[in-house]
């Protein structure tokens, strides 16, 4: 039986005598809504689920206000896969597929020669971008390598994607040795061994409390209040209009003629459509010109 009270939730926790911290997340509606507006191949759906889980866990462990973008770029059938998340656990995802992809395709078969790009964009402070070659079989292993290289912290990820109670679900756990240097490799290995005994149905179906007890009942674990995850696209009519105004006016006029006087712009992420007729476009141009005169663009 699935305990829906912990669907679309993220929990952080601390092993009090081990100097290791952890996180657990389960994405139900958050994941389903990502897939609803696109007919992605199954292998791409699976990869996006993994990336959503990874981004959620990364955003929680960074503890800052802002955004994290996890992006895969390659020269294979999957040209691009990108997930964005913020400190409120608002997530969105997008993929661009340029050739047929088998349902069982591996990461390497989908991406070809590719890189994993992690962009950290705080509301205040400097941006950071890390680029890692996708030279390991899974996104999980690539991210663990990222933590070793960039943070010098032992990190272990468990990421599972599947179906439970008739619904798509993606879930995962993170263990990381504390950055204060008090943790030992032996403690970390011990907890990692326990975590690896988790079954898919436990990740997908148990409450966080039941899952942590099942895995770590001999440990003292302090669990922090849950965060709710959600699919949230950042698109708007204003942003769509601004994007359209980047086109030459002659091209906009041509589009208006082809579309019988109304241009529709569809968000690539969530599928929302925005419609603009010529009066609306001229109004947007006037507003943009006023802002430019005021030096606000």
From Swiss-Prot:
Where does the record place it? Cytoplasm
Q: What's the main place this protein lives?
A: cytoplasm
Q: Name one Pfam family in it.
A: HSP33
Origin superkingdom:
Bacteria
GO BP annotations, alphabetical order: protein refolding
Query: rRNA processing among the record's keywords?
Result: no
Q: Name one GO cellular component term.
A: cytoplasm
Q: Which residues form a coiled coil?
A: none
Which GO molecular function entries does the Swiss-Prot or TrEMBL record give?
Answer: protein folding chaperone; unfolded protein binding
Alphabetically sorted, this entry's keywords are:
Chaperone, Cytoplasm, Disulfide bond, Redox-active center, Zinc
PTM note says: Under oxidizing conditions two disulfide bonds are formed involving the reactive cysteines. Under reducing conditions zinc is bound to the reactive cysteines and the protein is inactive.
Does the keyword Cytoplasm belong to this entry? yes
- Disulphide bridges: 233-235, 267-270
**HAMAP family, per database record:** HslO
Instruction: Outline what the protein does.
Output: Redox regulated molecular chaperone. Protects both thermally unfolding and oxidatively damaged proteins from irreversible aggregation. Plays an important role in the bacterial defense system toward oxidative stress.
Q: Which family does it belong to?
A: Belongs to the HSP33 family.
Protein name listed in UniProt: 33 kDa chaperonin
The species is Haemophilus ducreyi (strain 35000HP / ATCC 700724)
């Amino acid at each position: 039986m699935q305990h829906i009270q912990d669907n679309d939730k993220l929990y952080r926790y601390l092993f009090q005598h081990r100097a290791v911290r952890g996180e657990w997340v389960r994405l139900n509606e958050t994941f389903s809504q990502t897939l609803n507006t696109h007919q992605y191949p199954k292998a791409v759906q699976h990869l996006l689920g993994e990336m959503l889980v990874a981004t959620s866990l990364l955003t929680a462990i960074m503890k800052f206000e802002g955004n994290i973008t996890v992006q895969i770029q390659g020269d294979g059938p999957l040209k691009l896969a990108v997930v964005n998340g913020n400190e409120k656990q608002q997530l969105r995802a997008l993929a661009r597929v340029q050739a047929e992809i088998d349902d069982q395709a591996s990461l390497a078969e989908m991406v070809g020669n590719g890189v994993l790009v992690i962009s950290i964009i705080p509301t205040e402070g400097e941006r950071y971008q890390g680029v890692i070659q996708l030279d390991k079989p899974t996104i999980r292993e690539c991210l663990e390598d990222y933590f070793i290289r960039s943070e010098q912290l032992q990190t272990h990820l468990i990421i599972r994607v599947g179906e439970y109670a008739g619904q798509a679900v993606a879930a995962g756990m993170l263990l990381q040795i504390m950055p204060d240097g008090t943790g030992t490799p032996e403690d970390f290995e011990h907890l990692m061994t326990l975590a690896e005994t988790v079954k898919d149905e436990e990740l997908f179906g148990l409450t966080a409390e039941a899952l942590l007890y099942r895995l770590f009942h001999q440990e003292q674990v302090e669990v922090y209040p849950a965060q709710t995850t959600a699919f949230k696209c950042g698109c708007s009519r204003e942003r769509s209009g601004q994007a359209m105004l980047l086109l030459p006016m002659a091209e906009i006029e041509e589009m208006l003629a082809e579309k019988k006087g109304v241009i529709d712009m569809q968000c690539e992420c969530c599928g929302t459509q925005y419609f603009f007729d010529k009066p609306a476009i001229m109004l947007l141009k006037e507003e943009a010109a006023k802002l430019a005169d005021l030096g606000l663009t």
